[in-house]
UniProtKB/Swiss-Prot annotation:
GO terms for biological process: sporulation resulting in formation of a cellular spore; trehalose biosynthetic process. Residues 171-181 have a biased composition (Basic and acidic residues). One of its GO terms (cellular component) is nucleus. InterPro entries: Velvet, Velvet_dom, Velvet_dom_sf. Keywords: Nucleus, Transcription, Transcription regulation. This is Sexual development regulator umv3. It is found in: Nucleus. Belongs to the velvet family. VelC subfamily. Velvet-domain-containing protein not required for disease or sexual development on seedlings. Residues 73-93, 149-170 have a biased composition (Polar residues). Residues 195-388 form the Velvet domain. Its main location: nucleus.
Length: 412
């Protein structure tokens, strides 16, 4: 018996299903690649037309799925497959070739010779044969098309790498921020461009438009305030040498009006400054007699007749002692910052003194009166003036109680 007869006899002794399956596999995907240590059999290599038939007829390109083997053949291949040889696994042996991926490539790459694409890739090199170093090199290398331009993915990768801050740039940012924090601050501006008030050959007049008439004694605490009634309102007029009124100077920001309290001296009949009053607290035996904001700034508004005027309003003045008092007002001109030292203060332009008014105890206070038309006019223009529309007098309240009592007695 010859060697060829032995080969035929050995092939005929194999199970029929295995032989038919091998023939089907050879017809579809070609012969099995040689294992390690086996000699390559050139007689089993199919012709060129077999690859063409594999590319065009058998493989389902849209699905890209390997053909399903019968369970008996799959078990046989798993037993014959040695462990650790990933290149001979059933999944990798049925992967479509590189020719099928060229069909999904862009149009400018489909015209390229397939044989040239296959020649660039070594025979038998599968996806599992890539080492981590080769994969990293493949990802880092910029991909280019036929015209030599980089792909969009490689451009995004390069932009991401270039946008990452380097240690040197971070250090420069820290130095710059440190310089900004430790840089000397700019000197305060010398406000020389502000409109300065000039007193050359001008006449200043303070007109008391609203005289306080009465008030209620307030407590020693800072929250117990009883404002004067009515509120003190003064008007400023500045007259030029030619007799015209200087409205721009009246609205100057360096003009302020200061108020102080004066009390009648029963011995001399005059008035002296009333500054302090004795308290019951040993820690603070003295306190200020006049409570509230004692300095007011100018407010340019419309008068009752519609003309422009400059007003000073004191809204929260209260007094901590009973008696007869007067309010003394002084108009001060403050110099702009940087012109004179702060300790120099300002100089007095004109003064005004109110009529005497009375501060009552809580039992004797007759009650608050209704706000004047001037106070309502200023409040409508945005100036903070408290307005009272009702008359709350203690005497009227007592009269109403007496009248109601008489009516009840008459009904009886």
């Amino acid at each position: 018996m010859s060697a060829q007869d032995d080969i035929d006899t050995g092939a005929s002794n194999q199970p029929r299903s295995v032989v038919e399956t091998d023939q089907q596999r050879a017809a579809v995907v070609g012969p099995r690649p040689p294992r390690h240590g086996e000699a390559e059999c050139t007689d089993a290599i199919p012709a060129r037309d077999s690859y063409q038939r594999y590319d065009t007829e058998v493989v389902d390109v849209p699905s890209m799925r390997p053909p399903v083997l019968p369970p008996s053949r799959a078990n046989t291949l798993s037993k014959q497959q040695p462990r650790g040889d990933l290149s001979q696994s059933s999944a990798s042996s049925h992967l479509p070739g590189l020719r099928q991926f060229t069909r999904l490539a862009p149009a400018n790459m489909q015209g390229k010779d397939r044989s040239g694409l296959l020649s660039d890739r070594p025979s038998g090199l599968l996806l599992s044969d890539h080492t981590p170093n080769s994969q990293h090199a493949h990802r880092s290398a910029p991909q280019r098309d036929d015209n030599g331009r980089q792909s969009a993915a490689s451009n995004r990768l390069s932009d991401t790498n270039s946008s990452a801050p380097s240690p040197g740039s971070t250090e420069n940012e820290r130095v710059r921020m440190h310089d900004q924090r430790t840089a000397p601050s700019a000197p305060p501006p010398l406000l020389s461009d502000l409109p300065r008030h000039s007193t050359d050959n001008k006449t200043y007049r303070l007109i008391i438009r609203q005289q306080p008439k009465q008030g209620r004694l307030c407590g020693l605490g800072s929250k117990d305030k009883r404002p004067l009634d009515p509120l003190p309102i003064l008007q400023l007029r500045i007259i030029r040498p030619d007799g015209t009124e200087d409205e721009d100077a009246e609205n100057s920001s360096n003009l302020v009006l200061q108020v102080s309290l004066c009390k009648e001296d029963p011995i001399t009949g005059g008035y002296t400054d009333a500054v302090l009053v004795e308290t019951n607290d040993p820690s603070y035996p003295w306190t200020r007699m006049l409570e509230g904001r004692i300095v007011a700034s100018a407010n340019l508004a419309r008068d009752l007749d519609g003309s422009r005027a400059c007003f000073f309003v004191f809204t929260d003045l209260s007094i901590r002692q009973e008696g007869q008092f007067r309010l003394a007002f002084k108009l001060l001109a403050l110099s702009p910052p940087g012109q004179v030292p702060a300790s120099a203060g300002g100089h007095v332009l004109t003064e005004a003194l109110t009529e005497p008014f009375t501060i009552y105890s809580p039992r004797r206070f007759p009650g608050m009166t209704e706000s004047t038309d001037l106070a309502k006019c200023l409040a409508r223009q945005g100036i903070q003036v408290p307005v009272r529309n009702d008359i709350r007098k203690k005497q009227e309240h007592l009269d109403s109680l007496t009248a109601s009592t008489d009516d009840m007695n008459g009904l009886e």
